[in-house]
Each structure stands twice: as C-alpha cells, then as structure tokens.
C-alpha cells in the first residue's frame, strides 16, 4: 500500500507517458521501500545490480527465451530484469506471501507484460509446487536464506528430490531450492541462484547433495562470491551458483571472488557498473585472473572433497612488503633527534618567559 500511495503522488500525465515509465517508477518505489523495510526487504526485492548479474548469466548467448521461471519471485523484479536483457515470451513465478504475490502481478502489468504472457502462483514452492511437468529455458532465484521446511519423508519419492540419496535438512532449505530449480531447468537452459556461503562447504546431507550435483550430474558451471552487506535486510556474504545440464567446458568449474570489489555505502555496500561488468566478462570468457578468478578442474574439486569454499581455489592473499630493519632503526634515530631539537626550542621559549630558570 505504501508503494501505491507514493505512486499516486507522482505527477504522471498518461497521454504523454509510455507504460515503461510507469513500470520503472513502480520498480523504483519498490526499491526505495525495500531500503527502509529491514529484514522483510529480502523477501520481495533483489538489488538491481545483483539482478543484472543473474539476468546476464542466464541470457548469455541467447537472443530470446521461450520462458523464464523464478520459484521465489517476490515482487517479480528479477523476472523482469531478464526481460531487459533479451526477448522473453512468457514469465513464470511462484510466491508464498500473498501481498508480495500481488506486488509481482502488478509489476508485470505496469511493465506492459500482457496477462496471458505471465503466470504467477501464490503458494509455497517447496511444499506445493506449481508447473509440474514443465521445464524452462532460464531458472533464476534469490530464495530466502537457510529457511526452514518440513523435509517430510514423502519428498523422498518426489521427482524433484529423489535420486540424490538425501533431503536438505529441516533447518536449512537452501539445497531443497537448488534441487527444485534443477528439476525445472531445460536441458539447454541456464540456472542462476543466490545463496549464503554455507551451501559451498556444509557437510552431512548437504554435502551429499552437493557431491551428487558435481560428481554424478556435472551440472555446476560457476561459483561467484559476492561482497557482504549488498542485500537489504542481511549483511552476510552471498554467492551465485550457476548450473547447466549441457556444459561446454565439462571438466572445469569457474570460481570468481568478487567479495572485495564493491563501493562502500553509508548503510549498505553496492556494486558499480564496472564491477558488474567485470564479473560478467570473466564468467563469459571463463578466465583465470590472478587473485580474482580460477577455472578449477573436477579433479581439484574432488581432491577438496567437493568443498567449494572459494578461498580454496582463488588465492587473494596479498604479501606484505619486507621490512627494512636498518631503515626502521635509522627512522627512529631521526625521530629522537627531532624530539631533542623541539625540546631545546621549547626550553628556550620558557626561559625567555621566565618560566624556566637556568640550572
């Protein structure tokens, strides 16, 4: 309601305005509201620069998409960002929160997406999935981090989760979202998801699922580490995982450490256009760049017991310059000499004032 009240205050003249302007204004106000909404902001909005990275990844090399799917679509901003990068015929999404679900539908209409070209459902994605039997050219999401779910035994026979040998733990649904998204990904499609760093190294059931995705399926394409404090409502560092079912470079996984590339803000860090482009260009070229990115072999990942923690692959350590002890000693002598000279000057002034007498 706050978004709509602010939108109503804007001096629009419909006859002079394209529908895109109204949609962009709505998107802008959602972003402004997210900036003041605290933890709740993460439930419905992904910062534009992060959305841009995800969208460019899933549209890489494609001049059109038949469909794009976001299983936790929030206000729909991530879906719409994909449409800015390439032509999208149909948008699919699911959102549990009723208010946010309505935000998403309104966002679609205000961006001139015809009603028959989008299908947004209001339900719990993991517990009551929509669109079963469908696969999508692009699957994209910024799901709630380490959310709880039932992990009910019935899911052991669910086609989204069966075959992995384990279900994601009740206390952390991160890998349940990954499994769900992989299931909906077309054989020629690309999937990109934002998650906390814990998915890279946590063990037990999550370790089993992670190993299966890499060793058995070989779906993992890239791991991109993002800076901390760039999302609304949380300061934890996050990463982007990219999956493909038909990979061109089947023997390598690209690791990018962009955690130190950010612009410091008063309350929140953000990515500049140049920093976003560096991530995208490195991903496209699959480049190894000193202290920034590394193309690891599957054998290297296996040797690390399928632990994907980025510092294991990208060494960002900066060696300190060697200390010249002789120079340090000389500097200390010079400082002592300067102090002695200053003390002499002070004593001379004090004697002139009669404050200090000759001994």
Predicted regions and their residues:
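Residue-level signature of catalytic and energy-coupling elements of molecular machines
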Residues: 25, 54, 104, 241, ...
């Amino acid at each position: 309601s706050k978004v709509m009240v602010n939108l109503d205050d804007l001096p629009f003249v419909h006859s002079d305005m394209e529908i895109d302007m109204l949609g962009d204004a709505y998107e802008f106000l959602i972003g402004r509201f997210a900036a003041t909404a605290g933890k709740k902001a993460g439930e419905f909005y992904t910062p534009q620069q992060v959305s841009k990275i995800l969208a460019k990844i899933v549209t890489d090399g494609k001049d059109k998409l038949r469909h794009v799917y976001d299983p936790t679509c929030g206000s729909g901003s991530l879906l719409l960002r994909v449409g800015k990068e390439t032509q999208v015929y149909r948008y699919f999404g699911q959102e549990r929160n009723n208010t946010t679900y309505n935000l998403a539908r309104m966002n679609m209409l205000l961006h001139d997406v015809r009603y028959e070209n989008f299908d947004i459902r209001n339900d719990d994605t993991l517990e009551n999935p929509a669109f079963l039997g469908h696969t999508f050219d692009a699957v994209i999401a910024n799901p709630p981090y380490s959310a709880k779910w039932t992990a009910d035994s019935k899911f052991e026979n669910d086609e989204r989760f069966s075959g992995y040998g384990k279900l994601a733990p009740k206390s952390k649904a991160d890998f349940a979202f990954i499994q769900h998204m992989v299931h909906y990904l077309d054989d020629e499609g690309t999937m990109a998801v934002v998650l906390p760093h814990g998915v890279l190294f946590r063990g037990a059931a999550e370790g089993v699922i992670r190993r299966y995705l890499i060793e058995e399926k070989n779906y993992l394409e890239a791991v991109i580490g993002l800076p901390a404090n760039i999302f609304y409502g949380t300061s934890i560092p996050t990463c982007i995982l990219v999956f493909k079912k038909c990979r061109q470079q089947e023997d390598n996984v690209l690791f990018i450490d962009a955690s130190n590339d950010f612009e410091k803000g008063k309350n929140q860090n953000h990515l500049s256009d140049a920093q976003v482009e560096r991530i995208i260009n490195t991903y496209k070229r699959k480049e190894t760049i000193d202290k920034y990115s590394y193309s690891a072999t599957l054998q290297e990942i296996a040797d690390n017991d399928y632990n994907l923690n980025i510092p294991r692959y990208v060494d960002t350590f900066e060696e300190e310059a060697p200390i010249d002890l002789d120079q340090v000693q000389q500097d200390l002598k010079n400082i002592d000499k300067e102090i002695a000279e200053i003390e002499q000057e002070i004593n001379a002034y004090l004697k002139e004032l009669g404050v200090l007498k000759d001994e």
